[in-house]
Structures are given as C-alpha cells and as structure tokens.
Amino acid sequence: MADRIERILERVEKPVRYMGKERNTAVIPFTQAEVTFAFCFPDTYEVAMSHLGMKILYSILNDVPGVLCERVCMPWVDMMDALREEHIPLFSLESRTPLKLFDIVGFTLQYEMSYTNVLHMLALGGVPVKAADRGEDDPVVIAGGPCASNPEPLHAFIDAFLIGDGEDVIREITCLLRDCRKESLSREQQLGKLAKIEG
C-alpha cells in the first residue's frame, strides 16, 4: 500500500499533510503494541497540529507501556477523492496503518461543524459508521472534547463518550481496553466496563 500512497501524494495539494515523519512522533512498531489508539482530529492537519490538547494526549498515551497512539486527520477534498478512486483506506500519519486496523479510534470534538467529518473519517477508514453495525473485529470508537458534553447528535455513531477532562481518564480508558484485549473479552463486555468509568 505504501507505493500506492506515494503515487496519490503526487496528485494532491499540500501532500505534507499526509506524510508524518515529524520529530518526536511515536516510534514503537505497530505490530509490537499491546493496544493501538488512532487519535482522530476531524479537521485538516494544519488545524490539528495547532491544537495543544492533541499534543498533550498524544504524549500521555505514548508514555503508557504497551500503548501506541498515532494521529489521523481529516483529508482535504482532493485527498478524499484520491483515496476513494484508488480504494485506499484513510490511514495514520506515523505508520500509514488503515483506521480500521486500530483497536481504539478516538475523536476529539472541538466544535459541532466537525461532526460530518467524523462520519467521513470513519467511512474512509473502513470502520462501520453506525455503532450498531460494528462487530468483534472493529475498533471501539470513543469521543471526547468540549462537544462531548452533549452526546446526543452523535450517539448512533460513537461507542462511548468521554465527558470531562481527557487528561484525567484517557490513560485509564486505554489501559482498561488493553486489559480487556488480553482477557479476550467481547465487545459488549468491553463497552460495559467502559460505562463504569467516571468522566
């Protein structure tokens, strides 16, 4: 898939948005992680990288033993079209892993106008858009941030909402899901345990 991605980068405006490789990014191999977390910002790379909260949570998660957090940003229209034309799923910046292969897909909801981008990112990444359509092999989709205080508009698409300060509980959530994977718990059991965590 790497060669196909390189080819489409030649066709899009601002290909640096999708290249990654910045200093201080996560370096643990994807296959060696006990649990993988796709940190999704439903806006372009430029907006995402100007957001301090994303950098803080990225650092917190990658400091947890066995956890790998990678970033995924909303592609611009030209890249969306190229991904669809070439049948390439939306991928992470660090390892270019398709969104659907992560254990956890986490969205930060900073403003309501980004809600449609959440749905676009799920669809582009090969993750069933509706929570009810997800099976045992699909990621657990969570969302936090200021707009998570009103989960109703996205409740049909998100498995669990983090209401409150993400810095306080994101480590607990990720470690819980890591342990659930070790115990081979079902999706329903995992979500049941998540529901018991206080926001």
Regions found by a protein language model. Name each.
Residues 1-15, 64:
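Helix-enriched interaction subdomains in cytosolic or periplasmic regions
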Residues 3, 21-26, 59:
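ER/secretory pathway lumenal C-terminal domains and tails of membrane proteins involved
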Residues 20, 27-29, 38-41, 103:
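Flexible, glycine-rich loop/tail regions that form catalytic "lids" or insertion modules at the edges
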Residues 22-32, 95-97, 191-192:
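Short boundary motifs at domain starts and secondary-structure transition points
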Residues 33, 65, 137:
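Residue-level signal for beta-strand positions within conserved beta-sheet cores that form or flank
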Residues 35-37, 43, 48-52, 56-64, ...:
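General detector of N-terminal leader/presequence modules that precede the first folded domain
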Residues 37, 41-42, 48-59, 66-83, ...:
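Low-complexity, highly charged intrinsically disordered N-terminal segments
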Residues 74-199:
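Glycine-rich beta-alpha loop elements in corrinoid/cobalamin-binding modules
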